[in-house]
């Protein structure tokens, strides 16, 4: 294009260089090239050939330059169009990418919105769960606070009961230190016993009846008859038999009349008797009649109770346990193996189960002298030494009694004797029935109740049992070594039957600080059995005291 433009310029220059020659020859100069379209034909005819050629060359050069410019412009436009098209393509690509990004962002927004909705739902559920959990926790905390308050109330009751037990223990220590062994305490009220004096046949009191003396056993009961016959003292056996009256023989534990009365009573009254005697029954137990206090028999001297009950002297326990007969063991609720273990001393495995103490502990509680060990060994082996010694002690106790003392025994004390023997028969019968019944009421306890008119009901079961022991130990504690084997430790504090090996648990040495607990247990069992036998059979109450017995029905 530049070459064409150069050629056109050269042609134009050549035309100009040639034009002055004819111009000088012509009259009128030629018009410019631009004016050719305006020049008329007549004027063109007047021009010369050179002028026409120059005008034509000029017009052609102009046209060529215009065409070149136009082509240049077209090329420039095309180039610009190409650039614009490239930009458009790039923008299209960018737009496509942006659209893809926009779609991705939309999808992401939808996903995030779904997550937000899910988060809202989860937050609502979490708040609902939190409110429900807070309510449940509030209820649980309130329940546990109530339980905690109940436990605190129970703990306060236990603390009060423990304080009462401590006061009772202090009272027991004071009473033991004061030496209250002289006041005799009976199972029934003294008024009932005084009214029984006229109805009881007057005969010499048996020293070994087990009521309140420190003798070694009831010589008038059939099981002790066999015991003395086997121990080689027939003289002592015949003496109380000849002294007994027909009424006395009717009240004996081996008579066929009395055991039929308790059988008619049945066992449903027995749980009531487990609650212990009533407060009216407790009142006369702690008071001895003036006649009893003025005429204490040899077995109720102040030396007897500390030696044989409180001090844990096991001489009477060992003699009585070691010389037990088969009938005695059978009434106590044992099999032949039970009898053999019970008669020969056995092992020390019983009292730890019934009371929770170890054999060494009980061995320390009941420490005996060498005479006690010797007497227990001879009685356990079936020799005649223990029985002869028992017979000698009983004969001395009967021969040393003055006529006035015998009259006292023939009156009030004989009623206690017959009453205790009938209670023994009842206890034997209950033990025979207990062996055939399931022991479902072993852990039955009386819940503590409050009553301003009755101090006993405000205490716990343990405090009531200790109170029952204390009210019964002053009248029954001195006769504990003389009671049959069915009374002593035949059931634990929880009602479980004792092992036949408990006889051997009374050997050993005891310190004064370790003595009271097994003695408390023994006297408590005796007291519960006596109250059980008296309360569960109204026939004994009607027959003896004329419906004046104040024990539990």
UniProtKB/Swiss-Prot annotation:
Residues where Asymmetric dimethylarginine is found: 541
Biased composition, class Gly residues, residue ranges: 376-389
Basic and acidic residues biased stretches: 236-260, 391-403
Skewed-composition ranges (Low complexity): 1-28, 209-220, 491-508
Pfam families linked: CCDC85
Primary localization class, coarse: other
Keyword annotations: Cell junction, Coiled coil, Methylation
Family: Belongs to the CCDC85 family.
Subunit annotation: May interact with ARVCF; CTNND1; CTNND2 and PKP4.
Function: May play a role in cell-cell adhesion and epithelium development through its interaction with proteins of the beta-catenin family.
Protein known as: Coiled-coil domain-containing protein 85A
Organism: Homo sapiens
């Amino acid at each position: 294009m530049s070459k064409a433009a150069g050629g056109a310029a050269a042609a134009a220059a050549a035309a100009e260089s040639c034009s002055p020659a004819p111009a000088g020859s012509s009259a009128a100069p030629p018009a410019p090239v631009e004016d050719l379209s305006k020049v008329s034909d007549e004027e063109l005819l007047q021009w010369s050939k050179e002028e026409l050629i120059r005008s034509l060359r000029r017009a052609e050069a102009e046209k060529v330059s215009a065409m070149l410019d136009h082509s240049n412009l077209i090329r420039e436009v095309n180039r610009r169009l190409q650039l614009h098209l490239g930009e458009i393509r790039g923008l299209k690509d960018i737009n496509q990418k942006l659209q893809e990004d926009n779609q991705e962002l939309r999808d992401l927004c939808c996903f995030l919105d779904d997550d937000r909705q899910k988060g809202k739902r989860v937050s609502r559920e979490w708040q609902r769960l939190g409110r429900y959990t807070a309510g449940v926790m509030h209820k649980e905390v309130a329940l546990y606070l109530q339980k905690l308050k109940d436990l605190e109330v129970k703990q306060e009751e236990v603390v009060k009961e423990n304080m009462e037990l401590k006061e009772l223990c202090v009272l027991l220590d004071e009473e033991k230190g004061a030496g209250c062994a002289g006041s005799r305490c009976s199972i029934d009220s003294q008024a009932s016993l005084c009214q029984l004096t006229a109805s009881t046949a007057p005969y010499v009191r048996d020293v070994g009846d087990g009521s309140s003396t420190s003798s070694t056993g009831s010589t008038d009961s059939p099981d002790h008859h066999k015991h003395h016959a086997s121990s080689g003292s027939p003289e002592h056996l015949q003496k109380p038999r000849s002294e007994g009256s027909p009424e006395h023989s009717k009240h004996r534990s081996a008579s066929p009349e009395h055991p039929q009365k308790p059988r008619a009573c049945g066992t449903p009254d027995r749980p009531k008797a487990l609650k212990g005697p009533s407060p009216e029954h407790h009142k006369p137990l702690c008071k001895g009649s003036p006649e009893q206090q003025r005429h204490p028999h040899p077995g109720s001297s102040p030396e007897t109770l500390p030696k044989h009950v409180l001090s844990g002297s096991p001489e009477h326990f060992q003699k009585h346990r070691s010389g037990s007969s088969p009938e005695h063991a059978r009434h106590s609720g044992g099999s032949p193996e039970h009898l053999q273990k019970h008669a020969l001393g056995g092992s020390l495995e019983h009292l730890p189960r019934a009371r929770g103490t170890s054999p060494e502990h009980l061995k320390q509680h009941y420490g005996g002298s060498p005479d006690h060990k010797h007497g227990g060994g001879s009685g356990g082996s079936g020799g005649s030494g223990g029985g002869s010694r028992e017979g000698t002690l009983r004969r001395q106790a009967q021969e040393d009694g003055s006529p006035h003392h015998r009259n006292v025994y023939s009156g009030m004390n004989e009623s206690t004797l017959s009453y205790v023997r009938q209670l023994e028969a009842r206890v034997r019968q209950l033990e025979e029935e207990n062996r055939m019944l399931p022991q479902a009421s072993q852990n039955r306890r009386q819940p503590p109740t409050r009553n301003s008119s009755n101090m006993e009901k405000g205490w716990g079961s343990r405090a009531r049992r200790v109170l029952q022991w204390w009210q019964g130990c002053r009248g029954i504690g001195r006769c504990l070594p003389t009671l049959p084997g069915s009374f002593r430790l035949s059931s634990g504090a929880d009602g479980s039957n004792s092992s036949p090996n408990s006889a051997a648990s009374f050997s050993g040495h005891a310190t004064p600080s370790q003595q009271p607990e097994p003695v408390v247990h023994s006297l408590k069992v005796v007291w519960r059995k006596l109250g059980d036998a008296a309360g569960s059979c109204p026939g004994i109450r009607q027959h003896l005291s004329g419906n004046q017995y104040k024990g539990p029905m």
